[in-house]
Design a protein with these regions (language model features):
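Long beta-strand-rich cores associated with HINT superfamily self-processing modules
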Residues: 9-141
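General structural signal for secondary-structure boundaries
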Residues: 1, 85-86, 167-168
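Non-catalytic peripheral regions of nucleotide-handling enzymes
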Residues: 21, 127-176
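Structural motif
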Residues: 2-9
Length: 176
């Protein structure tokens, strides 16, 4: 993800290749992480989500959502595919919170709609411009995003919903 740029095509589960419309990075210092543990990454070790998934270690923000396709999701929620925040999948083993590190850079990219993309072989979400996620983007990047997508400033962008239903903490534990 560190080498992606605006215009680069990204594979999506539902719409094939889609161009990146906007991309930004936010760096979090060691001091930031020590002050606020919520800024530490959630790490998925290889195989944490199933055989070979992810293929390599995957580190994401706590709120980044992971695709879960499981019979339990269908049984409990009537949807065979759901999105779950990384923090709700932490199990202290193959999915754990990383300790504060010298520097962590989060990369966000926006497509024409909310999509499911591949991250080290795991299915995760593209950036979803909602009030909570916009707070994760620094001021200059947020202004750039509002310039490119003016409706975002009032949260009226044509992203009517997420790519899959989103489970909350208690719900997520049923499929984790």
């Amino acid at each position: 993800v560190e080498n992606l740029a605006v215009g680069d095509p990204v594979w999506t589960l539902d719409a094939g290749l889609q161009p990146i419309r906007w991309i930004a990075q936010r760096s979090v210092t060691l001091a930031d992480q020590q002050r606020d543990a919520r800024l530490c990454r959630v790490v998925f070790e290889p195989g944490a989500l199933g055989p070979g998934v992810p293929a390599q270690r995957l580190a994401v923000s706590r709120q980044h959502r992971i695709w879960c396709g499981d019979w339990r999701a269908g049984l409990y929620f009537g949807q065979p595919e759901v999105l779950v925040a990384a923090k709700d999948l932490v199990n202290g083993g193959l999915v754990h919170v990383a300790p504060p590190q010298a520097a962590v850079t989060y990369v966000h990219f926006l497509l024409d709609g909310h999509q499911i993309v591949s991250s080290n072989g795991a299915l995760t979400e593209s950036f979803f411009p909602a009030a909570l996620s916009l707070g994760a983007v620094d001021g200059a990047a947020r202004e750039e995003l509002f310039t490119l997508f003016p409706d975002l400033a009032t949260l009226r962008l044509a992203f009517p919903k997420t790519a899959r239903p989103v489970l909350r903490g208690r719900e997520a534990r049923l499929v984790a």
